[in-house]
Amino acid sequence: MSRLKQGLKTRQTRFALALKVALLGGVVAFSSVAHAEVILKEGITPASDASQIPASAKLRTDTVVAGISEPQGIFNPYFFVNGWDENVTNVIFSRLIDWDSQGKLVPGLAESWTVSPDNKVYTIKLRPGLTFSDGSPLTAEDVAFTLTVLLDPSYDGDTDITLANIAGGADYKAGKADSVSGLKVIDPLTLQVTTTQPGATTLAKIGGPVLSKAWYGKGYQRGNLDYLRSLHGKPLGNGPYVYDKYIPGQEIRFHANSHFYRGTPPTPRFIYRVTNPSTNFQLFQTGETDYDAFTSRPDDIEQLKMLGFANINLYGSSDYSQVEFNVHRPALQDKRVRQDRKSVV
C-alpha cells in the first residue's frame, strides 16, 4: 500500500500523506492536527506550538490539501510520464497485489493467491463484492483486460509486463495470436496466469492497478489503444478517492470513494494544490495547504521550525541518476574517450 493512500484511508495515519507527495530528498512539513502522536512515532519532529495553526487550516475540517508540482494530466497508472501524475493515480486506483511498509507483497484487490509447485502458474482470487468507483463490478475479466493492454503492441507506457513471461504474451504482441493464452478467467473472482518460466518479480509485475474493461475497453481491438488514451483525463478507478476535476496550474480535486473496498475514507474531500518553490512556504504558512515538500537547506528548515505548528520530516533521496554513452557516435566508440569522460563525471 502506498504511503499516500494509507494516509488517506485512516485518520490516524493521515500525516503519512506527505511522505508520498515529495519525490525528491528534502523536508516534508504538515500542520499539526489530531492524532499526531501516532505518526510522530515514525520519526517526525513534532510541532513546538500547535496553537499557532492558521485559522484557515483549523476551519477546514472535511478536506486535506497537499502541495504538488503541476502534473501533465495523464491520469492512468500505466501511461503517466512523471511522478506528479503518478501521485494523482495513486489515490484513484488500487493495486491487485500491494506492498506493506517493509516491501513485502500483501493482498490488495486480490484476497489471496497460490503458486504451482514449478512456480509457473499463479491462481489469483479476488475479494468478493469489489466494484469500481461508479459501482460497476470489478472481476477477473478486468484483471485479464488490464494485462492484455500491457501486452498490446501499441502500448507505449513504462510498465514492462514482458518481464513476467506470461505464456502467449509474445505471440499476442507480435500479432501471431488473437488472445493471450496464459490468461485464463476461471470464474468472476478467479484468474489463472501461466508463465513460461519462474520469476521472482512476477507477482509484483502482474499485481498492478486494475482498469475497468467496461470503461477503458469499449471497442478494444489489438493494436489500437486510442480510445483508452482518450480517457486519460477521465479516470475511473477503485482507490480511496474519486477524481472530480483538474484545473491546470491550480489544483486536482477528489471526493471519498464510498465503494472503496477498505471502507469510505474518513476525510470527505482531498485536493492536490499546485505549488512550486516560490509559493509553497507562503501557502503552508497561511494554512492553504496541509502538507508540502521543501528543500533541505538549513535556512528552510529553520524557517519551518519558527512557524511553531509544522511537523517536519527530514529524509534522504531515494533517486538515482545515470549517464549513458551513445556509442553510435564515432567519437564515443573509442573506449579511452568514454573512460576519460567517466572520470570527469
Task: Label each PLM-derived region with a short phrase.
Residues 46-52, 65-117, 234-237:
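N-terminal lobe/hinge region of extracytoplasmic solute-binding protein
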Residues 111-159, 192, 283, 331-333:
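Aromatic- and charge-enriched surface segment that lines or borders ligand/interaction sites
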Residues 229-232, 256-303, 331:
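Ligand-site clamp/hinge motif
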Residues 65, 139-148, 188-194, 239-240, ...:
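Alpha-helical secondary-structure segments
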Residues 197-265, 269, 279:
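Gly/Pro-rich hinge or "lid" segments in bacterial periplasmic/extracellular proteins
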Residues 61-70, 111, 121-124, 143-146, ...:
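Short, well-ordered beta-strand elements
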Residues 144, 158-219:
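Surface-exposed binding/hinge segments that line
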Residues 301-314:
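Ligand-binding "clamshell"
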